Amino acid sequence: MDILLLVKAAIMGIVEGLTEFLPISSTGHLILTASLLNFTGEIVKVFDIAIQTGAMFAVIWEYRVRLRATVAGITHEAVAQRFVRNLLIAFVPAVISGLALGGLIKEHLFHPVPVATAFVVGGLIILWVERRHRALFGDRDLEGGRVARVETIDDMSALDALKVGLVQCAALIPGTSRSGATIIGAMLFGFSRKAATEFSFFLGIPTLMGAGAYSLIKQRDLLSWGDLPVFAVGVVFAFLSALVCIRWLIRYVSTHDFTVFAWYRIAFGGLVLLSAWGGWVDWKD
């Protein structure tokens, strides 16, 4: 087994875990990182999605108490039933749009320049939503007071879930960010930052699980048992880095907004576009 390949897999796993739940696009960062590392070949077509299962398991582990209670109460507790219903409703639009448009989008947009453009556009949208949120609530949302219509995920209606599910479809465009679309979209629909962030975490479980399973089944002919160590390293590092990120982000959103991520997206995306335009970096597709 090529040690350098394992190191690249570890780096990719760390990038996935640190970016999956931040509004900065894990797919975009993986595409750019793979380009810089020259991490290419048939295996990459499956690897990027497969290692997302590591991030998914981090959510399951961090919220294992809530998830265990939900499973135990699914047959007789209204709160558990509503929670599962909302997750399923929010998940369905991504399934439909992914099956209908996924191949076309992957063919035309999974390249560094479109990703960088989406980074910049997404950053501008976050700035606008944060400005709107602050105009409505001031700093009260950062001070622990109840200000939003949906203060916790238990306050959600089926319509709320559907709207969040629809905005998640925008994340099919690489560089948009699944967590960014769901968190910022939820805030636009009246969620508190914490409720938006937590629902985005939970929605990632069926979304990442479904995407990973579909990719592995569809691309199974590209895989061999010899690839297992590479995938295992990527998944483990994605799990560990995602766990750190989840715990940090929940604390962060209690007292901070998402403006810093918007400026990061704009600066990073702008730098990639500038380097591509100037020919400073050979961004490999």
Curated annotation (Swiss-Prot):
One of its GO terms (biological process) is cell wall organization. InterPro entries: UppP. This is Undecaprenyl-diphosphatase. It catalyses: di-trans,octa-cis-undecaprenyl diphosphate + H2O = di-trans,octa-cis-undecaprenyl phosphate + phosphate + H(+). The chain crosses the membrane at residues 3-23, 41-61, 87-107, 109-129, 197-217, 226-246, 260-280. Pfam families: BacA. Bacitracin is thought to be involved in the inhibition of peptidoglycan synthesis by sequestering undecaprenyl diphosphate, thereby reducing the pool of lipid carrier available. Catalyzes the dephosphorylation of undecaprenyl diphosphate (UPP). Confers resistance to bacitracin. It is found in: Cell inner membrane. It comes from the Bacteria. Keywords: Antibiotic resistance, Cell inner membrane, Cell membrane, Cell shape, Cell wall biogenesis/degradation, Hydrolase, Membrane, Peptidoglycan synthesis, Transmembrane, Transmembrane helix. It comes from Methylibium petroleiphilum (strain ATCC BAA-1232 / LMG 22953 / PM1).
